[in-house]
């Protein structure tokens, strides 16, 4: 009888794992619209962490930086180098805050999904998860990037910016227009897919082996999360730089 039960229990366990879900939604009604409340909650937490950390690190700035101020200046220099490389020496300055904010929000959001036990915070329905675990967040970030590179191109070239759509030949007009729509799609789906996949893998591995296997997977998730933030920020800066350049 035990021999018969063993395969059955194994199959039941596999079935339970196959039903693992990440990011069940907690809905709010705002102005007649249904929004994902858990995304707003976790986003506010991430923003509070960033603002609090920055305030503490630079509350007493010194001429010769030490400690937290030194770390913040190192991060700022990293953002300057990243933005300068992608946008160019003459135009990069105003875009450092935008690229830096994008990177920090995505980086902390991704790491919060890997490090913070969101599941212990109970909601009336649904569950908390990293902000970037929701497609609405990644699409919003991608759309902000789209608005930024359209603004950069129009500010630099005026209406002449739209001339790029018929270069090098007007035949490419549909393809060039389509390219501008695929940029935010690729940014949003790449970030969303990687973060969701990481949390699903951890959730599946925690079920059969809760103590040993998930640890290296979590470290891999932390590394991947950082890489995804860097890729998003780099591509955003590259798109902005491309919009201000002449057609190649």
Swiss-Prot record:
Query: Which compartments is it annotated to reside in?
Result: Plastid, Chloroplast thylakoid membrane
Q: Which Pfam families match?
A: ATP-synt_A
**Keywords, A to Z?**
ATP synthesis, CF(0), Chloroplast, Hydrogen ion transport, Ion transport, Membrane, Plastid, Thylakoid, Transmembrane, Transmembrane helix, Transport
A GO molecular function held by the record: proton-transporting ATP synthase activity, rotational mechanism
Q: Which SUPFAM superfamilies match?
A: F1F0 ATP synthase subunit A
Quote the CDD domains the UniProt record gives.
ATP-synt_Fo_a_6
Topological relation to the membrane, as annotated:
Multi-pass membrane protein
User: Where are its TM segments located?
Assistant: 38-58, 96-116, 135-155, 200-220, 221-241
Q: Which PROSITE patterns match?
A: ATPASE_A
Which InterPro entries does the entry link to? ATP_syn_F0_a_bact/chloroplast, ATP_synth_F0_asu, ATP_synth_F0_asu_AS, F0_ATP_A_sf
Q: Which domain of life is it from?
A: Eukaryota
Q: Which GO terms describe its cellular component?
A: chloroplast thylakoid membrane; plasma membrane; proton-transporting ATP synthase complex
Briefly state the protein's biological role.
Key component of the proton channel; it plays a direct role in the translocation of protons across the membrane.
Stored NCBIfam families? ATP_synt_6_or_A
Query: What PANTHER family does this protein map onto?
Result: ATP SYNTHASE SUBUNIT A, CHLOROPLASTIC
Q: What does the subunit section of this Swiss-Prot or TrEMBL entry state?
A: F-type ATPases have 2 components, CF(1) - the catalytic core - and CF(0) - the membrane proton channel. CF(1) has five subunits: alpha(3), beta(3), gamma(1), delta(1), epsilon(1). CF(0) has four main subunits: a, b, b' and c.
What family is this protein classified in?
Belongs to the ATPase A chain family.
**What is the official name of this protein in its record?**
ATP synthase subunit a, chloroplastic
